[in-house]
Amino acid sequence: MNRQGKSVEISELSKIFSSSGSIVVAHYKGISVAQIKDLRKKMREAGGGVKVAKNRLVKIAIRDTSIRGISDLFVGQSLIVYSDSPVIAPKISVSFSNDNNEFRVLGGVVEKGVLNQDSIKQIASLPDLEGIRAGIISAIQSNATRLVRLLGTPQTQVVRAISAFVDKNQQG
């Protein structure tokens, strides 16, 4: 790759690092091209991407940024999995790692915070934004249903009491 090509690659990498909500760094030694294509497809469908780049160029791209702490992860055959969502890249990377033993998640960045492998795995276990929204809506709906039942119960009891009183007076 010539100097101009390297410059273009560095600017592409800088754009990925500055605009992504989450970035996962992984080793892919021993992974087939078909498996990498599968990972790329999953990330593309989720709105993210996978980038294989020379470690030296990645280190130059992050040298003067707040995420330069991940530069130590770029040794050997490394790739970057990224997405705008803080959960998507970790979730898909960890899932892919569980299915492919040769693919090893090393660490990454979420919302400009440098994280180790364990933290990335913890984030991967979190529900995505849609799951959180569904949980909140479910909680609100169940509480609203309980409230309606609670408000309806005294009225029902009053009606039953009046009905019993009327029945008693009609009999007696």
Swiss-Prot record:
HAMAP family assigned to the protein according to its UniProt record, in alphabetical order: Ribosomal_uL10
A Gene Ontology term for the protein's cellular component: large ribosomal subunit
UniProt-listed InterPro entries: Ribosomal_uL10, Ribosomal_uL10-like_sf, Ribosomal_uL10_bac, Ribosomal_uL10_bac_type, Ribosomal_uL10_CS_bac
Subunit-level organization: Part of the ribosomal stalk of the 50S ribosomal subunit. The N-terminus interacts with L11 and the large rRNA to form the base of the stalk. The C-terminus forms an elongated spine to which L12 dimers bind in a sequential fashion forming a multimeric L10(L12)X complex.
Lineage: Bacteria, Pseudomonadati, Pseudomonadota, Alphaproteobacteria, Hyphomicrobiales
Swiss-Prot/TrEMBL GO biological process terms: translation
GO molecular function: large ribosomal subunit rRNA binding; structural constituent of ribosome
Keywords: Ribonucleoprotein, Ribosomal protein, RNA-binding, rRNA-binding
Gene giving rise to this polypeptide: rplJ
Name the record gives this protein: Large ribosomal subunit protein uL10
SUPFAM superfamilies in UniProt: Ribosomal protein L10-like
Pfam families, per the entry: Ribosomal_L10
Role description: Forms part of the ribosomal stalk, playing a central role in the interaction of the ribosome with GTP-bound translation factors.
Entry superkingdom: Bacteria
Family: Belongs to the universal ribosomal protein uL10 family.
